[in-house]
Amino acid sequence: MIIGTFILDFQTIDFEPDAKIAVDMLSDYQRLYQLENSFALDPPVQSLGWSFAKMFLAGRFVEKIYAHQAFKIEASKGKKLEDKFVAWLQKELKNRGCSAQIKIAPEMKSI
């Protein structure tokens, strides 16, 4: 399975704590799978009390996570792998207290 880079929209009304939860969780997975520089969260743009940022996940990173979490990811909502992965990631973040909403960015859909 070859997966390209995931480009996600990260939207929240409380950027700093939500971003910290997301970065900490992804850093833990990155360490677990012995990878480096496998994700990025851009600085946010503020609008009407919301913060909007782009999150990038390297394809290899997504593949490693999927290999170890396939059962949970496959049980998530969605028809395509990308949708299931994002639904799983959203749930994992929520379980850790992150209130951000994530979704596949239009830039990823057009690739």
Where are each of the predicted segments found?
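Conserved short beta-strand edge segments in small beta-sheet-based binding/regulatory domains
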Residues: 73-110
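Broad gene-expression machinery/nucleic-acid interaction feature
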Residues: 3-7, 52, 99-103
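A structural detector for beta-sheet-dominated domains
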Residues: 9-11, 56-58, 103-105
